[in-house]
């Protein structure tokens, strides 16, 4: 938004994000369109006031619904009717969970609704969601559809989204390394506390068992883990 949004969008949405009051999401994939973004079906219908009404579903949305912030700002890829086919017809929209009034206060609930939770291995501190846009749970402004606001130029949404994803990719890689390192620390702690077997050549069956960290092959595997993540 700092790179492609208007001054009004920055003041309305970015500043509260930097203050920690608003959170954000990236809404790209859909149930029928994962990495094949040319096949997305979410549509954005233009309104007389310059806003848009969005209708569709978005899948695999991290932090798509929670109560940790005052508001959630969804950045949504969608197609305006009559847009070119494929990725050349994708636009980017701001779709807040709660509409923001001109004075910065929160207004009525937008028609963005949690439809389901996706359970992903390794992620326990954040929700991963399926979101419905414009399916009628709420009617902001007494009209159907989730209210959205165009970011940048129509049909250039994918370029805007990739601008953000370049930085997000670094975060994903860092998260993977941290998960791997946490796994190593848990494995090391377990190996130090789990007794099993004795030294090769030990003859006395009454001697105490060794913690498995003293077994050569376990030490080899722990060293491999440590070398990967460090």
Regions from the PLM with identified roles:
Residues 26-29, 47, 54-57, 62, ...:
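Generic beta-strand/beta-sheet core signal
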Residues 1, 25-27, 55-61, 71, ...:
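Glycine- and acidic
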Residues 4-5, 9, 19-20, 36-37, ...:
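Alpha-helical interface subdomain recognition
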Residues 32-35, 65-67, 84, 120-127:
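Short Gly/Pro-enriched turn/cap motifs at secondary-structure boundaries
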Residues 1-46, 71:
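Long, structured ligand/cofactor-binding scaffold of large enzymes
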Residues 51, 55-109:
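A short core secondary-structure module
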Residues 21-23, 39-41, 49, 71-73, ...:
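Active-site lining segments that contact anionic ligands and/or coordinate catalytic metals
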Residues 60, 99-115, 120, 127-168, ...:
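A glycine-rich, basic-preceded beta-loop-alpha segment at the flavin cofactor/substrate interface
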